[in-house]
Design a protein with these regions (language model features):
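Polysaccharide-binding surfaces and accessory modules of carbohydrate-active proteins
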Residues: 5, 10-13, 17, 21, ...
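Carbohydrate-binding surface patches
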Residues: 241, 634-677
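Aromatic-lined carbohydrate-binding/catalytic grooves of carbohydrate-active enzymes
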Residues: 324-461, 474
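Active-site neighborhood of glycoside hydrolase catalytic domains
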Residues: 389-393, 425-582, 592-597, 601
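C-terminal beta-strand-rich structural cap/linker in extracellular carbohydrate-active enzymes
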Residues: 693-722
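Conserved nucleotide-sensing/catalytic segment adjacent to the nucleotide-binding pocket
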Residues: 784, 793-850
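ATP-dependent NMP and nucleoside kinases share a basic, alpha-helical "lid"
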Residues: 856-904
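Small-molecule kinase domains that catalyze NTP-dependent phosphoryl transfer to phosphate-bearing small molecules
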Residues: 906-946
């Protein structure tokens, strides 16, 4: 069980896979916090210490005991008016103006499954994935009951917290402050990491040492805001990406919030997260219940990367509900930076035609399609289609776009209204305003009062009337201002619940519409929004260099699959910076990927590059979105921004690097990878170079010398699973051979084996042989790779000429009698070398052949201590070859062989009819030789003995 209650000590223990959270009901009935950190099974009540500290109050129930004080004890949910003078989680005012609530334990319940919150987004899980602990605390005199909710997701290493506040008295009360979670630590040397920003530059990481006093941040803007994200990390001073302890709190809420970190008089630490108490004063009548939104907590003993992975898993698996969360999503192009307000229906159709030709999946018609909306001064609230502007109905436009083979998306901003709109003229009171005062404008618009159901219903009906006109595939929901005219203490909270109600109705009615959140970019990028929309436009800033910072900060809590990221035009519309299309593409691939530009203005070369970009993204999309994301550098500190995605099986990895700064004669920069298997062998797709996982993680890969500023690179690594499977199979076949033991005079020949790797040209013989050699070396078995390309009688060019001569003189039968026989191959030579190796000879003269006339040599090679000789060669299964112990055949077809030969570009005549026929004849012989193989590597990657 994830939740355990010790009735003797009244200790609650919450266990996840790697963490433990513990609290205790003490003898006076107070709920004290004991421990949160790395997993252990000990009762941690010994951490509580008691001392007589001046000016620290003592509860009356403690009698004359001056060592007992809530001002110094670690509490689970501290309240105002109890003698605790630190920051508190709850402040309630009664109808007489008194602010004092003393919460004592009443009861608890442990149940399977994860609690849900009425009207609020929250982590969800099945009954076998989570458990819930509900602890009831109360103050009978104040008439208040507080239900502390804990959700334990064991596999995710996540604990969620929420609070229900009930008015159990007969009069009214007012909630002045309500936080969802408090974490009290009996020690106090921490750093606080927060994510600050501004419009078009969100979620910059800032790390601050927590000194005495309070460090606080939050939002009073009505949204979670561009300025501070509702997320915090409390870290040990020496914590890095890969080591050290750190705690995370993430608020599942899209409105005003507050986070407070305090180091008190005796160096203890308190961390609070919840609703902002500014512009908040919530009345609660007798019998009513108030719900505090949820906080997701997690702890990592292994640095920030592990903490991020825990949050990424929780959000992607237990917050995002959309069916699109784990599906391939469309590559889209948005009309905004292509046309802004200046477009017609034909403009959108032309954009769709261009998109289809580039391989883009969807066109999104952004702001300007409704009412009389030709600028940002009018028509918000009037959600009817401007058919004059579009040149027809929306249904007709959607059909025209779909006819181009692309999907159709549309932009909305339901929460806003312009004063120049029919809606405002009919219902001016529906806009949020302080009675008797003129409202604060922003972007020439006001906010509709979504706390009122009749307002929501009107807009919902308008929006549905639009959506029902045709098959809309995608909706971008925007929100382009902050809330200023807060006329009541309950408004900000009720407004957010109204937005959630609207979104719930929308996604329920249109489950097949992909919904993307937006608030001037990343002004409402939070877990609350992700409950309804699986992705959010990360920032209005599409500059590739700025985006490395924005996406870096975002990644600490939110998975890549949630980050809307697009390639935009240059000079960039926000910064004026010019970066290459390649750099813009690589940066946007660290998100949902799309385009914000006018393709009609692109050159043919740029269009072709975009086609290749899209192919690349689609090749790696599931790896990027479903893989484990690793930050390799910090764009705030390093000269490059580097990140990577590793598949869950660790068999594939994609590394992306952007040079942020360059200088003359710079030192070579090495990027160290993460998350790979140390002993596995990986091949880099573009170069064919092989590495062990340990080498990539410990030594890294060098960037090309003289990398230019803003230049970008991608490296794709594939684990050579066939080689590992082959190695394991060979070990079985080898039986009792002691290959990793030193030779004796009698054993040198007995313990030597020859393995041949053979198959069609380009079938991967060289790759598998090199990887197989590495696996032997990993096992302390010395191994040598011999290439059969050294053993024809003639260099490659002359051999091709001889093949053609034979064909011209003797036809196909003569060519068949030449290929792979002693007429073409010096079998005597290679058999001699293999025989000497098997006999235990240490110095063997090995033949080497180049590609130019006369480029043939014989070099003495030291085989001392070498136990395994791997021969990689097309003819490694030939009847003329002697001394092979384990022949291994790589299956391939002539078509595959031809395609590989052409792709590798080593032979300029690879596609000629004659060479293709040679390949077919060789394959005929290989198919026969394959029957003699001891081990076969199938085209499906399976390895089996025959």
């Amino acid at each position: 069980m994830a939740i355990i209650f010790n009735p003797n000590k009244k200790i609650f223990t919450l266990q996840t896979a790697h963490t433990t959270y513990q609290m205790q009901v003490d003898r006076l009935g107070y709920l004290l916090h004991l421990y949160y950190g790395a997993k252990n099974t000990c009762d941690m009540d010994y951490v509580l210490t008691y001392a007589d500290r001046g000016f620290s109050g003592n509860p009356y129930a403690a009698g004359m005991n001056r060592t007992y004080s809530l001002d110094t004890l670690p509490q689970e949910y501290p309240t105002l008016g109890t003698g605790d003078f630190r920051n508190i989680a709850l402040d309630i005012k009664n109808e007489h103006g008194t602010e004092s609530v003393e919460l004592l334990y009443k009861s608890h319940e442990i149940r399977d499954g994860k609690y849900a919150l009425k009207g609020l987004p929250a982590v969800w899980a099945s009954d076998d994935e989570a458990q819930t602990l509900e602890i009831v605390l109360g103050d009978d005199i104040a008439g208040v009951e507080v239900h502390l909710l804990y959700g334990v997701l064991e596999a995710c290493d996540v604990i969620t917290r929420s609070v229900l506040i009930k008015n159990t008295g007969s009069g009214n009360i007012t909630i002045e402050k309500a936080h969802a979670a408090c974490l009290d630590m009996v020690y106090g040397d921490y750093d606080v990491i927060r994510f600050y920003g501004k419009h078009a530059m969100e979620r910059n990481l800032e790390r601050t040492h927590l000194g005495h006093g309070t460090l606080s941040f939050g939002s009073r803007r009505g949204t979670s805001s561009h300025q501070y994200n509702p997320a915090v990390i409390l870290a040990q001073r020496d914590t890095t990406e890969n080591a050290g302890g750190c705690y995370g709190m993430l608020f599942v809420y899209s409105g005003n919030f507050s986070c407070e970190a305090e180091k008190d008089q005796i160096n203890q630490t308190r961390l609070l997260m919840g609703l902002s108490d500014e512009l908040f004063s919530y009345p609660l009548a007798a019998g009513e219940t108030f719900t505090v939104p949820e906080v997701i907590m997690s702890y990592s003993a292994d640095g920030f990367s592990q903490l991020s992975h825990q949050y990424h898993t929780c959000i992607s698996e237990h917050v995002c509900r959309s069916r699109f969360a784990h599906e391939v999503r469309p590559v889209l192009i948005n009309s905004w930076e292509a046309a802004y307000f200046d477009f017609t229906g034909d403009t959108i159709v032309d954009l769709a035609k261009e998109a289809a030709s580039l391989g883009i999946d969807m066109v999104v018609m952004d702001d300007g399609w409704f009412g009389k909306r030709d600028d940002d001064n009018s028509s918000l609230g009037d959600w009817f289609v401007n058919e004059k502007k579009l040149g027809g109905t929306l249904s007709e436009l959607i059909d025209r776009v779909h006819a181009q083979g692309v999907k159709f998306g549309i932009w909305i901003e339901p929460e806003m209204v312009n004063e120049d709109s029919n809606l405002y003229r009919e219902h001016p009171d529906w806009a949020i305003q302080i009675p008797g005062k003129l409202p604060v404008r922003s972007r020439n618009q006001l906010i509709l009062d979504f706390s009122r159901k009749e307002v929501r219903d009107n807009i919902f009906d308008q929006i549905c009337a639009v959506f029902d006109q045709g098959k809309i595939d995608y909706v971008k929901w925007d929100m382009n201002r902050s809330m200023a005219d807060v006329y009541a203490g309950n408004l900000a909270y009720d407004y957010v619940l109204g937005v959630y109600d609207f979104m719930e109705r929308l996604v329920t009615r249109y489950p097949d519409i992909l919904l993307e959140g937006c608030s001037g970019g990343g002004g409402r990028f939070d877990a609350g929004m992700l409950y309804y929309s699986p992705q959010i436009w990360c920032s209005d800033n599409t500059d590739a260099i700025n985006r490395t910072r924005i996406q870096y900060g975002t990644s600490f809590f939110y998975p890549v699959s949630t980050m809307g990221a697009h390639v935009s035009a240059v000079p960039n519309h926000q910064t004026g910076r010019v970066t290459s299309l390649k750099t813009r593409g690589i940066t946007a691939m660290a998100g949902t990927f799309g385009y914000e530009l006018n393709p009609a203005l692109l050159s043919d070369e740029e269009k072709e590059e975009i086609r290749e970009q899209i192919k690349t993204f689609k090749k790696y999309e599931m790896l990027i979105n479903e893989g484990t994301y690793w930050r390799l550098t910090s764009p705030f500190e390093d000269e490059v921004a580097a990140w990577m995605s590793v598949s869950r099986a660790k068999d594939r990895a994609l590394v992306s690097v952007v040079r942020l700064y360059a200088e003359a004669n710079a030192a070579t920069y090495y990027v160290k990878l993460k998350g790979l298997e140390s002993d596995a062998v990986y091949i880099e797709e573009n170069t064919g170079r092989q590495y062990t996982g340990a080498a990539l993680m410990n030594a890294g890969i060098p960037l090309p010398f003289a990398t230019k500023e803003y230049e970008a690179y991608q490296f794709s690594f594939i684990r050579l699973d066939e080689a590992k499977k082959l190695y394991d199979e060979i070990k079985k076949v080898c039986g009792n051979l002691k290959l990793n033991e030193a030779d004796t005079a009698d054993s040198a020949s007995d313990n030597r084996i020859v393995i041949s790797i053979y198959g069609g040209s380009g079938s991967g013989k060289t790759t598998i042989a090199a990887a197989l050699q590495q696996y032997f070396l990993n096992d302390n078995t010395a191994c040598y790779v011999l290439t059969g390309d050294n053993y024809p009688h003639r260099i490659p060019m002359r051999n091709d000429e001889e093949r053609l001569n034979v064909y011209n003189e003797s036809g196909e039968d003569g060519l068949r009698g030449y290929l792979g026989t002693p007429k073409e191959i010096d079998f005597d030579r290679i058999n001699k070398e293999l025989s000497e190796f098997k006999a235990g000879k240490d110095i063997i003269e090995i033949k080497h052949m180049g590609r130019e006339d006369g480029d043939i040599s014989y070099d003495e090679t030291d085989f001392t201590g070498i136990k395994v000789l791997i021969l990689e060669w097309t003819h490694g299964g030939s009847e003329y070859l002697k001394g092979v112990d384990i022949p291994v055949f790589l299956e391939s077809s002539p078509e595959e062989t031809k395609a590989r030969r052409i792709k590798r570009g080593r032979d300029e005549n690879a596609a000629s009819p004659f060479i293709c026929r040679v390949v077919e004849l060789e394959q005929e012989k290989l198919d026969l030789q394959g029957k003699n193989a001891r081990i076969v590597v199938g085209k499906d990657g399976k390895v089996y003995e025959q």
